[in-house]
Amino acid sequence: MASRRLLAATITYMLARDALAPWRTALGNAELGTEVRGVAAEKRRARALDLLEKVGLKGFEDAYPKALSHGMRQRVALARTFSLGSPILLMDEPFGALDAQTKLQLEDVLLSLWQRERRTVLFITHDLSEAVSMSDRVIVMSSRPGRIIADVPITFGRPRSVRALQKEAHYHELYSQVWSCLEEGLSQ
């Protein structure tokens, strides 16, 4: 049982869907995980307010999920994910259902939060552009049975901006390299 608690304190998981509690405000949702863990009210509120501001939701703290766009709800979920302070974040296609513009914005928000807090992030995505832009390495998996077929180092420095990277020739070279690995894996 103790090992489960240790694991729960070490890893935070962010879903593709926001999974917000509809009866809680943006602030209430952002501090939910820390509340469950027993963090003092003042401390969890301050942390949640700081993160809501960082994800661009200052002024929406008292809004309920039904009043927020899908992108705003994902921002709340991102704030909730970081609020726990876990050293490892598992993110399963967190921006997959967003429109292209909102997705780019949230990718930059995530990079900014990472730059500030330096967490280990395992980011699952089917979007090669997202993988190349945000990662330090891209692990390419084969189709069934899933196995690692390539480990591609991404050599961009930090801090970085997704939109700025996508204009660089090296970005396109890495994208092509990852795409070639993926094609090879699909043909096996």
Where are these regions (language model features)?
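Catalytic "switch" loops of ABC-type ATPases
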Residues: 16-21, 127
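Short coil-to-helix segment of the ABC ATPase nucleotide-binding domain corresponding to the Q-loop/switch region
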Residues: 24-31
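Conserved ABC ATPase "signature" region
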Residues: 31, 35, 42-60, 112
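Conserved ABC ATPase signature
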Residues: 64-68, 72
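Hydrophobic anchor residue at the start of the ABC signature
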Residues: 78
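A short, proline-enriched helix->beta-strand linker immediately N-terminal to the Walker B motif
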Residues: 83-87
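Catalytic Walker B motif of ABC-type/P-loop ATPase nucleotide-binding domains
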Residues: 89-92
